Amino acid sequence: MTTVHGSTIDIPTQDGVADAYLTHPDDGVPHPAVLFYMDAFGLRPHLTKMADRVAAAGYTVLVPNVMYRHGRAPVVELPEFINPAERPEIFQNLRPAMQSLTPEAAMRDAGSYLAWLSASPLTTDGPVGTTGYCMGAGLALRTAGTYPDRVAAIAGFHGAYLASEAPDSPHLLADRITAEVYFGHADQDSAMPPEQIDRLEDALTAAGVVHRTEVYDGAHHGFTQADTAAYDAGAADRHWKALLDLLGRAL
């Protein structure tokens, strides 16, 4: 297995400084870049392990703490394993940070993350890939639509409210996307019901975006997150194959 090197770094943004986890093969040569968007629980050991796995496949991976305006990660105290009974209190504590991350603020930040990756000697020239989980899937989709000249691949897993009726819903950026797209939805996910899955699919198809959308039978919201009760090993394995296949094709 490829040895990777991970570290915590700081990235200047228009609104401050974002802490982030950076990981890459420990071989001294540049690699294609991947912008990895966290779920709502944020930067924590499980996510850094996931990022390391992507890096081991031959990528330089950046995982920003997108809630940096409310403090360095972890923004709120998290248990080693997040039990269902603890989720309401955790989300209550996270709500101010989540609500302050408006689409406009998130995309200003995305420009800073992409600029940092472009300037880094650890990355190759050319476009990046982006992947996101839970709310991060929406951030990945917005990034691909806001910076189409910089993003060649976008993946999202158990994404939330990607095609709502809100006037700033992420799916409304579909006609700006030039990247190849993959979404893996959970069929037991109230945050991404069938009507939103269909609306997202219709938007991508109408825009002529090269894409693939799959619904993972029996999976719940958060199925990739091994430190939660929603984890589904089979669905997580399926996600890894889909993600790494996409990055391998597009980058």
Identify the residue ranges that each predicted region occupies.
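N-terminal cap/leader regions of alpha/beta-hydrolase-fold enzymes
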Residues: 1-251
